[in-house]
Design a protein with these regions (language model features):
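Hydrophobic alpha-helical transmembrane segments
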Residues: 1-11, 40-45, 118-135, 209-220, ...
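Hydrophobic transmembrane alpha-helices of multi-pass small-molecule transporters
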Residues: 1-59, 67, 176-286, 397-400, ...
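Juxtamembrane/transmembrane-helix boundary motifs in multi-pass membrane proteins
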Residues: 2, 20, 51, 55, ...
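Alpha-helical transmembrane segments of multi-pass membrane proteins, especially transporters
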Residues: 3, 25, 29-36, 56, ...
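Transmembrane alpha-helix interface/packing and boundary motifs in multi-pass membrane proteins
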Residues: 14-23, 101-110, 141-148, 229-233, ...
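Membrane-embedded alpha-helical segments and adjacent helix-loop junctions characteristic
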Residues: 41-129, 260-339
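Membrane-core helix-loop-helix motifs of multi-pass transport proteins
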Residues: 125-207, 344-355, 368-418
Length: 418
């Protein structure tokens, strides 16, 4: 059997085992790569190890370490609380402010940081406004999904790394615009579906704030320096973030043990580990095979919609960053060349990532699960909250939004900005 087909089948098996056994897909992928490499005899030890991207590790480690420090320090949350309070008297602006604040946090610190921020910040907002809890959570997390793929965020750098391997330079600005358009539509649909316009908008949102401490000011200065170095000077994001992190630790902003504890090692291992197996899938011709299969069943009109739906389905059973992104992103260049027509690289990539993000509202995913658990865990909201109904609602919402995103892809919306 063709080694490329074998590599693809092993990738599918790794994803399935990780899902059903609740194991880290990255560790499974590395073990599978070792077995495939040695048993097939087609790969040396050096070639197997070459699949582990040290540059991606440094990028993820540096950025997640810095934003772990920022998050633990609490400076960013205090800034966002002040922003929300500025518009506290404009009740109709609350959903918009939640969307934008989550977008900003996610654009800086990545999707999961945006998710954690919005789930924590939304509960007191729900108490003050009377808006439907699920509605505000969906709107806030749509904002977090919209802003996650920037040059500064860990998520954006993962995509940037995968695009660079295909010779595609940049594209994150267009991707972020497409993500924002799609997630704004999803947020708007949530506002209509949950009848946010019928909520009695009286009172004022006033979140509790504290004066920024000297350590929080230092952390904010470090964050600003990092953004300037990356966006204005074009320096490497991982190296800059790592350097700023070390300076903050040395300055006593946070102790070293707490800083390293804040790093999501499980996610880093998952993303970089899958890369080892994906390197074999690529070098063995597996991506070419996968591309030809997709191209055989699609054309320039349907490719984006089909890719969006495929990514959404994959995301119901696996991690976006750990599986969907490293599996589908490498197919972008070859799919565009194979299918042609009006298909664009960033347009196709946008369809894939938007489909995956649209599926994240499922209660089986980290986003949907955290939304439900955050509401159910609140002593005020839990009394009138039906867990089973919320579970069904979130799952159906996830399915519906994948369908909506796929229709937008079919309409060519994601090819406007490419």
């Amino acid at each position: 059997m063709n080694i490329g087909i074998v590599a693809l089948l092993i990738l599918v098996a790794v994803i399935a085992i990780g899902f059903f056994r609740k194991l880290n897909v990255g560790v499974l992928a590395m073990a599978a790569a070792v077995i495939l490499g040695y048993v097939s005899g087609d790969y040396t030890t050096k070639e197997i190890v070459a699949g582990y991207s040290s540059s991606l590790f440094i990028t993820l480690f540096g950025l997640t370490l810095l934003f772990g420090i920022i998050t633990t320090n609490g400076c960013l949350e205090q800034v966002m609380r002040r922003l929300i309070n500025v518009f506290g008297k404009m009740m109709w602006m609350v959903p918009v402010i939640l969307f934008l604040s989550a977008w900003c946090v996610s654009a800086l610190a990545g999707g999961f940081a945006g998710l954690a921020f919005i789930c924590g910040i939304t509960i007191p907002v729900i108490h003050a406004t009377g808006y439907d809890p699920l509605m505000l959570m969906i709107i806030g997390n749509a904002g977090a999904q919209a802003g996650r793929y920037t040059r500064v965020s860990p998520d954006g750098n993962i995509v940037l790394n995968l695009l660079a391997k295909q010779g595609i330079d940049g594209g994150l600005m267009s991707l972020t615009i497409n993500m924002t358009i799609a997630m704004f539509i999803i947020a708007s649909l949530a506002f209509v579906f949950f009848r946010g316009y019928r909520t009695k908008k009286t009172g004022t949102v006033r979140l509790e704030i504290e004066p920024l401490s000297p350590k929080q000011w230092v952390a904010l200065v470090g964050l600003v320096i990092m953004i300037i170095c990356i966006m204005a000077l074009g320096l490497d994001s991982g190296l800059v973030a790592l350097t700023v992190s070390v300076c903050l630790i040395a300055a006593g902003v946070i102790d070293e043990k707490t800083a390293f504890h804040s790093v999501p090692w499980n996610t880093i291992i998952m993303v970089t580990g899958v890369g080892v197996l994906m390197n074999m899938v690529i070098t063995s011709g597996g991506i070419e095979i996968l591309t030809k299969v997709i191209a055989a069943f699609t054309n320039s009109v349907t490719a984006s919609g089909a890719s969006c739906m495929t990514a959404g389905i994959m995301s119901w059973f696996s991690s976006t960053l750990g599986v969907v992104v490293p599996t589908l992103t490498p197919t972008v260049e070859e799919l565009v060349e194979e299918i042609g027509g009006g298909l664009t690289q960033i347009g196709l990539l946008s369809a894939m990532l938007i489909g995956s993000s649209s599926a994240c509202f499922s209660p089986a995913s980290s986003v949907g699960g955290l939304i439900i658990s955050s509401i159910a865990g609140d002593p005020i909201l839990r009394d009138g909250f039906d867990n089973e109904k919320a579970f069904a609602t979130m799952f159906l919402w996830s399915v519906a939004m994948v369908a909506v995103s796929s229709l937008l892809a079919l309409a060519g919306i994601y090819n406007i900005f490419h």
